[in-house]
């Protein structure tokens, strides 16, 4: 029940694992959750469909997703791998 609640709230695998440990529940690796899809939905709900406009916006979105407990790899895939380099010319 805690797992489903946290996923519905938009939390990622790292945050979920931490919450389960804090509650004294054994974390199961067999959760059938598509974390990439979950992160995309959370990001879209918060920021809409538009991609990051500059490095600052990219960083803001990345911090938001990291705070929700998503892994760095998932965050890069959601925001577009290599996009942070595209903004370096700004």
Curated annotation (Swiss-Prot):
Q: Its domain of life?
A: Bacteria
- Under the cellular component aspect of Gene Ontology, which terms does the record hold? cytoplasm
> Subcellular location, in the record's words?
Cytoplasm
Which Pfam family, giving just one, matches this sequence?
Answer: RecX_HTH2
Bilayer-crossing regions? none
Predominant location category? cytoplasm
Swiss-Prot/TrEMBL keywords: Cytoplasm
Q: Which Gene3D superfamilies match?
A: Winged helix-like DNA-binding domain superfamily/Winged helix DNA-binding domain
Q: What does this protein do?
A: Modulates RecA activity.
Q: Which family does it belong to?
A: Belongs to the RecX family.
This protein is called Regulatory protein RecX
Name its species: Acidithiobacillus ferridurans
The protein's gene is named: recX
């Amino acid at each position: 029940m805690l797992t489903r609640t946290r996923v519905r709230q938009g939390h990622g695998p790292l945050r979920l694992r931490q919450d389960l440990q804090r509650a004294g529940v054994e974390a199961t690796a067999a959760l059938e959750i598509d974390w990439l899809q979950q992160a995309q939905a959370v990001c879209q709900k918060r920021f809409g469909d538009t991609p990051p406009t500059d490095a600052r916006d990219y960083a803001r979105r990345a911090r938001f997703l990291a705070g929700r407990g998503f892994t760095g790899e998932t965050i890069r895939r959601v925001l577009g791998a290599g996009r942070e380099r595209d903004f370096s010319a700004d």
